[in-house]
C-alpha cells in the first residue's frame, strides 16, 4: 500500500454504485489517475463540491495492490468559480479537460501538460483567454502528446505547401497540391490559415480573424477525432453554446 499527496485537476467524475464516484484526475507528479471516492455522493463534508470537472485540488491518494487507486480526501485549491458562471467559459473548460483526458495514459507523469491546463483554466477564470487561446491550448496539448500537426511543409514530400495547400488529418497536416492527389481525404485550405496556425504553434498569440478561427477549429476537430478514433463529446456542447 502506498500513500501520497499530489496536486490535481479533475478531468471527469461519474457516479458508481449507490453512493460512490469514480474520479479521473490529472496529477502533477503521477499523471492521469482514476480514483475511487467511497461515499462521495452521500458525504457532504468529505468531498463537498471538490469532484466536479476542472476543480484544482490537493488530493490524498492511497494505492493498493492490483493498482486500485482510492481517493482518501481533497483540499480545494481553486474552484475557478468565475468561469463556472459563464456558459461559454464552462464549455471551453470542459473541452480542455476532456482533450487532456483523452490524450494521456494512466500513471504517466505529465507535469508540463498539468501546468498548461492549469494556466489555461486560470486565464479562463480571469476572463483573459480569448477565442484564439483555445486553439493555442489545443496545439500545445497535441505537441505534449506527440501529435503536433504539420503546417510549415508538406506532410508527404517535405516540400513547401505552396500557394494552393491542402490539409489531411491522416497524413499529419498540410500537403502540397501535387501530393493532394495521393491524400484523398485532404481539403483545400487558405495559405493564411496554415500561417496563422503555424504562428500559434510557435508561441504567437495574435488573434485569428473569426472566419479563419472557425476553419481552424474545424480542422483541429477532424484531426483530433482521427487520431483519437472518436469525436470529443464537448465539441457538440461548444457548438450548442455558439462557440466556433
Curated annotation (Swiss-Prot):
Any GO BP annotation: double-strand break repair
Any coiled-coil regions, as ranges: none
Keywords: DNA damage, DNA recombination, DNA repair
Gene3D superfamilies for the chain: Nucleic acid-binding proteins, Recombination protein O, C-terminal domain
Gene Ontology CC annotations of this record: bacterial nucleoid
Pfam families with a match to the protein in the record: RecO_C (PF02565), RecO_N (PF11967)
Organism domain of life: Bacteria
Function: Involved in DNA repair and RecF pathway recombination.
Family of the protein in this entry: Belongs to the RecO family.
PANTHER family the record matches: DNA REPAIR PROTEIN RECO
HAMAP family (alphabetical): RecO
Protein name: DNA repair protein RecO
Organism: Myxococcus xanthus (strain DK1622)
